[in-house]
Amino acid sequence: QLSAKDTFTPINDPNKLPKSALELWQGYDARAEDLEVNTIEEWKTDEVTTRYLTYKVGRFKGANSRVSAYYSFPNKPGKYPAFVWSHGGGQRAEKNRSVYFAKQGFANIDINWLGRPVKEDIDTNTDWGKVDPTQGPRFYSKALRKGWKVNLQPDEFSIDPIPSPRNSNWILLSMAGRRAITFLEKQPE
């Protein structure tokens, strides 16, 4: 069931599918939806502040998709260069990595797109809702598929009900990264 607030309207007509990378992202504004940031935990040292948080990637099939992340920044007042760290497959976001980069003078957000448990034993984590760009239950306990989706065919956990480039896992993962940039843009550091 489609909610009026879904990030994308499903495409049912093959003639309306995007035919280029530009068309694929046409009409998508990563700043349009509220990030709905929830700070779960915060740690401070003399040098760095780190927050474990979740933010909204989008709304798909009537359910919100949220990604957890570590956001770290130097405590010294000022504006800092910032970047998104997106871990490799089978890995997870790591607090120590985020702290390391903050100590080097960078604000950074280390996103936990795969949803593997974090080392701090915090229960709140990535929740993709009714879509699933993950690598399956071996890595993500809330996985909706048995494994990594490697095609553009539709299933009950993809965006479009017809073969579509928007059914690629990489669309949702790219959105998670782009929304992390939106998060960084809104920070005072």
What does each model-identified segment do?
Residues V99-M175, F183-E185:
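Cap/lid segment of the alpha/beta-hydrolase catalytic domain
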Residues S68-Y71, G78-G88, N108:
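Short beta-strand element of the alpha/beta-hydrolase
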Residues Q26-G78:
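N-terminal cap/lid segment of alpha/beta-hydrolase-fold proteins
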Residues L2-T39:
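N-terminal pre-domain segments of enzymes
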Residues P188-E189:
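Alpha/beta-hydrolase fold nucleophile elbow
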Residues Q91-R92, R116:
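Active-site loop signature of alpha/beta-hydrolase-fold enzymes
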